[in-house]
Amino acid sequence: MESKVEQGVKNLNMENDHQEKEEKEEKPQDANKREPVVALPFEAGEYYVPRGSRRRFRVRQPIAHYRWDLMHRVGEPQGRMREENVQRFGEDMRQLMEKLRERQLSHSLRAVSTDPPHHDHHDEFCLMP
């Protein structure tokens, strides 16, 4: 079982390295996609070229992409493990949503109800005969 987990981790590391190499190869292409440089007159006979920001390349979101990849890749040997992880992730999300819903309902019901909060010994303070 551990060998399968270790193998899955190695495969993920290899995929991440491969994606990083692809990103490095894509950077020169992104640099070519920039807007054309406009030369502005600086002084007589000289031109000033604005440099602008260099962070114009596309920013990737690896975490969201990894989750999508995790959910949709089932045909591989590690597919069953990933499917179990997705099911566990779904169960955790359902539990969190139920807890959140219960807390929201308890707060809203407390605000709507006119009854005072009941204690174990509330009869001691009752003024009714």
Curated annotation (Swiss-Prot):
Coiled coil feature spans: none
UniProt keyword annotations, A-Z: Apoptosis, Cell cycle, Cytoplasm, Metal-binding, Methylation, Nucleus, Zinc
Localization: Nucleus; Cytoplasm
Binding of Zn(2+), residues: C126
Region (His cluster): 118-122
GO terms, molecular function: metal ion binding; molecular function inhibitor activity; RNA polymerase II-specific DNA-binding transcription factor binding; signaling receptor binding
InterPro entries: BEX, TF_A-like/BEX
Region of interest (Disordered), residue spans: 1-38, 108-129
Entry-annotated residues carrying Omega-N-methylarginine: R51
Chain intervals with Basic and acidic residues compositional bias: 15-36, 116-129
A Gene Ontology term for the protein's cellular component: nucleus
GO BP annotations, alphabetical order: apoptotic process; negative regulation of protein ubiquitination; positive regulation of transcription by RNA polymerase II; signal transduction
Main location: nucleus
Quaternary organization: Interacts with LMO2, possibly leading to regulate the transcriptional activity of a DNA-binding complex containing LMO2. Interacts with OMP.
Function: Regulator of mitochondrial apoptosis and G1 cell cycle. Regulates the level of PP2A regulatory subunit B and PP2A phosphatase activity. In absence of reductive stress, acts as a pseudosubstrate for the CRL2(FEM1B) complex: associates with FEM1B via zinc, thereby preventing association between FEM1B and its substrates.
Similarity section: Belongs to the BEX family.
Domain observations: The histidine cluster (His cluster) and Cys-126 mediate zinc-binding.
Identification of the protein by name: Protein BEX2
Organism: Rattus norvegicus (Rat)
